[in-house]
Regions:
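Feature captures hydrophobic
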Residues: 1-126
Length: 126
C-alpha cells in the first residue's frame, strides 16, 4: 500500500481522479497547474480538462503553478484520513479555520474551478 504522500500515493491519486465519472462532467473546463506542499514534499500537478496529465514529484524552484495548497504534514494527515475531524473534512473549511492550511498563488483560478477542485481534493481520501 502506498504511503501518503510518497510518489506511489500520488500515482494512485492521479488514477482515482482520472477514473472519476463526476470529474469527467464537472471538470471539463478545469485546466491549470497546481502545487501541493505536504510538509517538505512538494508536487506540481498539471490538470487538463479535469484530468491529471502530469505529476512532477521533483519540481525545481522555478516550476510554475497557477495556485497551490501548503500545510504541515499533520494537517494533511487529518485531511486525508478516512474520517477527518471537524474543520479538516473539507478544504474550504480548512482555508477558513486552519491557519496552517494556505492557498498560494492565484486564488481566482482556484475559485473559478471550485467545484471540480473540491471533488479532486475529496478524492485524496480514496
Amino acid at each position: 500500500m502506498a504511503t501518503f504522500p510518497e510518489p506511489e500515493w500520488m500515482e494512485r491519486y492521479r488514477d482515482r481522479v482520472n477514473a472519476d465519472p463526476e470529474l469527467e462532467v464537472i471538470g471539463s473546463w478545469f485546466t491549470a497547474s497546481l502545487s501541493f506542499a505536504f510538509g517538505d514534499r512538494r508536487y506540481v500537478v498539471r490538470v487538463e480538462r479535469g484530468r491529471i496529465v502530469d505529476v512532477n514529484a521533483a519540481p525545481r524552484i522555478d516550476s510554475r503553478a497557477s495556485f497551490g495548497f501548503r500545510a504541515p504534514m499533520a494537517v494533511w494527515a487529518k485531511f486525508v484520513s478516512p474520517d477527518p475531524p471537524a474543520l479538516y473534512h473539507d478544504f474550504f473549511a480548512m482555508l477558513m479555520r486552519v491557519p496552517e492550511f494556505v492557498l498560494e498563488g492565484d486564488g481566482l483560478v482556484a475559485m473559478q474551478n471550485a467545484r471540480a477542485l473540491h471533488r479532486m481534493m475529496n478524492l485524496m481520501r480514496g
